[in-house]
Amino acid sequence: MNANTPVTIVMIEDDEGHARLIERNIRRSGVNNEIIPFSNGTDAMKHLFGSDGTGIQHKGRALLILLDLNLPDMTGIDILRQIKENKYLKTAPVVVLTTTDDSQEIKRCYELGCNVYITKPVNYESFANAIRQLGLFFSVIQVPPACSS
């Protein structure tokens, strides 16, 4: 991944109204990157991990994952854990967007590796600021090339 690699936003949100609002807020904050929406965890996991289950197709790609914790088919916690345990996906920033403001769940998400935890309904300014900060992160990060032997 380099500074010219466009960031793809993967949005995992089962509520269609929330998904539209999130996308609108992203666009209002000036972000025009591709957004790939998923309404359930199963389809999102197939996309993230691919048909072989390794996630290798995302090697070198810049991803930003927006994750709801309350999905119809699996928990966002399980998705977060699997993303952060995968060698190709673990560096992708994960923004948790959920209605749950339980302090234990928030702590657990941060322990598993989420980068930002935002409680719905989303405060537009907080959300836009988080997205802008993550965009800045992507624009300044440089991954050193692999050493050849």
Residue ranges and their predicted role:
Residues 72, 102:
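The feature encodes the CheY-like receiver
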Residues 1-10, 15-36, 40-49, 54-63, ...:
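Non-catalytic signal-transmission and effector/linker regions of two-component phosphorelay proteins
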Residues 56-60, 84-91, 112:
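Conserved phosphotransfer cores of two-component systems
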Residues 120:
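A Lys-centered signature of the CheY-like receiver
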Residues 67-68, 98:
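Active-site residues of response regulator receiver
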Residues 115:
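Short, glycine/charged-rich "phosphate-handling" switch motifs in NTP-dependent
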